[in-house]
């Protein structure tokens, strides 16, 4: 039920806090405080109020197909409750409660991969989907119109975070803002309040996880091999580290949403969901977002493979070699996962179908 989910949602926040503060530097401690302040503040100050309100209206917190709020709340009350959940589930990084995610990039790269690709952010959007499908109900969201405002806020988060990502020279910062954008795809899928949107959002949890963890682990491999953290410092490294940057290319193309990688299916379902909801402007937003994805990800690859090493950089690339075996092997496995998910996405789709019935 919703209360049990809330308890373990909070435990996840507390158990990952030491990982963010791991380095013990002033910057790491500041980032960890921001992480804890935003995630605990939103969950206790907003999400918990929403949960108590749901119980007062419905008399239960059990997850139920078709939801538990239909006929129990007015359309206006449903909109307010959804706002409390959308902003109270801070791990979904919906603007303006997104700043914990860039702050957490001070953590070691394996932790960043955990936070930004798999555990923490996915707990946020998973909770959003659970609340939308099993507390509100997709049909009730559509009939009440209570999620209409969320469509536009999520679209704003998608585009604005992508634009900010383009301005970041630090590789992990660029990937962090990319994550904020990609998470809002999932929230938007729910807000469309139809089966295709919810399926696309749910599938995007898996496709984004594989693509983004590949990118973060590649960033870690680059740092281990070169001690470089900025995009402007990567010129020519692709020819020295072809495996690492090859895996980065696969992850980037999957995030962009191009075949033959898994991200293409989830984005396609989201576009179909927007068409089904007669939201043509949202279809345009998806298209623009994919172009912005190209603009902030592919220049990293082009610099690495096609630019000459910058003479101002330390050692000018001399002495640098491919990342150690234990660094690049995991990136290759997750990159292959992006490919497998394209050809076998039907299995995931069949697994997810029951949530829309």
Task: Walk through the language-model features, giving the residues of each.
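Cytoplasmic/organellar membrane-interface segments at the starts of transmembrane helices
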Residues: 239-244, 298-357
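Short, aromatic-rich membrane-interface segments at the entry and exit
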Residues: 4-7, 350-351
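Hydrophobic transmembrane alpha-helices and their helix-loop junctions in integral membrane proteins
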Residues: 2-5, 14-304
């Amino acid at each position: 039920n919703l209360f049990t989910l809330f308890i373990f949602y909070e435990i996840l926040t507390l158990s990952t806090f030491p990982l963010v503060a791991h380095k013990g530097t002033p910057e790491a401690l500041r980032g960890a405080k921001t992480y804890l302040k935003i995630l605990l503040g939103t969950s206790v100050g907003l999400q918990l109020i929403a949960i108590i309100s749901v119980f007062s209206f419905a008399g239960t917190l059990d997850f139920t197909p078709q939801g538990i709020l239909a006929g129990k709340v007015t359309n206006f009350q449903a909109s307010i409750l959804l706002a409390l959940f959308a902003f109270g589930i801070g791990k979904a990084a919906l603007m303006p409660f997104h700043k914990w995610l860039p702050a957490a990039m001070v953590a070691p790269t394996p932790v960043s991969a955990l936070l930004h690709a798999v555990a923490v952010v996915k707990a946020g959007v998973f909770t959003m989907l659970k609340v939308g499908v099993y507390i509100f109900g997709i049909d009730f969201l559509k009939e009440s119109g209570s999620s209409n405002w969320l469509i536009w806020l999520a679209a704003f988060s998608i585009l604005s975070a992508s634009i900010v990502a383009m301005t970041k020279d630090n590789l992990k910062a660029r990937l962090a803002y990319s994550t904020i954008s990609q998470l809002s795809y999932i929230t938007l899928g729910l807000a469309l309040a139809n089966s295709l949107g919810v399926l696309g959002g749910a599938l995007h949890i898996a496709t984004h996880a594989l693509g983004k963890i590949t990118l973060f682990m590649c960033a870690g491999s680059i740092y281990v091999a070169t001690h470089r953290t900025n995009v402007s410092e990567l010129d020519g490294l692709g020819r020295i580290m072809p495996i690492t940057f090859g895996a980065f290319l696969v992850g980037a193309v999957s995030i962009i949403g191009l075949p033959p990688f898994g991200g293409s299916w989830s984005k396609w379902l989201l576009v179909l969901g927007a068409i089904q909801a007669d939201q043509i402007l949202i279809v345009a937003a998806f298209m623009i977002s994919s172009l912005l994805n190209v603009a902030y990800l592919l220049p990293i690859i082009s610099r690495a493979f096609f630019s000459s090493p910058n003479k101002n950089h330390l050692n000018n690339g001399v002495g640098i070699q491919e990342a150690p075996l234990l660094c690049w092997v995991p990136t290759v496995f997750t990159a292959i996962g992006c490919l497998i998910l394209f050809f076998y996405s039907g299995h995931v789709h069949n697994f997810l179908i029951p949530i829309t019935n």
